[in-house]
């Protein structure tokens, strides 16, 4: 199979955002009266929507969930979004994919405002045709919905969606790809819990960005 478009997840796939997410999560939990120092519990916040994470991992209910999200964003909006780094080789990968003729989009659960800010901060905007994220008001938008929006803005018809591949690191990415009928590439850098993605089909497992680039260039549509 050959591909002509790629949809990227952001946290844990394009960037290593652990520092910012963990610090902002601790800040929000402390505001809710919870002291959390276990990094393994905090790492669970990398990938899923915030409201889902607070409700699922700390059994919060409204209005506490909304308060926690507000406190998280309070710190994230000032310093947290910059506590972030590109995975080695990402810029070269995007540059090579663009040169090979790929359309490149992002579909992330992160609010679109911050997703675009991060892409611009790392000087990656020239490589992206579309950056799609959730809205501040509806941060629990499904990954499938975000992927559909990205494909619509890339003007990819339903009859050609098999030529679009989703790249991600968590089950939310795999579930979204399956719901949209898209092939899925799993990146195995560090954050997904052991066994989380074993039951989801994927066309490739990339241990490094170089692996990912090599596979995509070998399967670029002519």
Annotate each language-model stretch with its function.
Residues 55-92, 100:
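Metal-dependent phosphoesterase signature
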Residues 113-165, 171, 178-179, 194:
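Substrate-recognition "cap/lid" segment bordering the active-site pocket of phosphatases
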């Amino acid at each position: 199979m050959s591909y002509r478009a790629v949809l990227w997840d952001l946290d844990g796939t394009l960037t290593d955002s652990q520092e910012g997410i963990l610090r902002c999560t601790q800040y929000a939990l402390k505001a809710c009266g919870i002291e959390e120092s276990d990094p393994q519990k905090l790492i669970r916040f990398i990938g899923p929507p915030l409201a889902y994470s607070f409700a699922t991992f700390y059994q919060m209910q409204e209005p506490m969930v909304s308060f926690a999200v507000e406190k998280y964003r309070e710190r994230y909006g000032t310093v947290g979004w910059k506590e972030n780094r590109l995975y080695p080789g990402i810029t070269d990968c995007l540059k090579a994919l663009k040169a090979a003729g790929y359309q490149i989009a992002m579909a992330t659960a992160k609010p679109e405002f911050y997703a675009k800010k991060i892409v611009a901060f790392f000087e990656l905007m020239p490589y992206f045709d579309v950056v799609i994220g959730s809205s501040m008001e509806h941060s629990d938008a499904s990954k499938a919905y975000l992927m559909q929006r990205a494909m619509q803005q890339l003007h990819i018809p339903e009859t050609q969606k098999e030529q679009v591949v989703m790249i991600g690191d968590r089950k939310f990415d795999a579930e979204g790809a399956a719901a949209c009928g898209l092939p899925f590439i799993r990146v195995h850098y560090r954050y997904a819990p052991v066994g989380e993605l074993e039951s989801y089909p994927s066309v490739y497992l990339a241990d490094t960005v170089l692996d990912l680039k090599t596979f995509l260039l070998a399967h670029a549509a002519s």
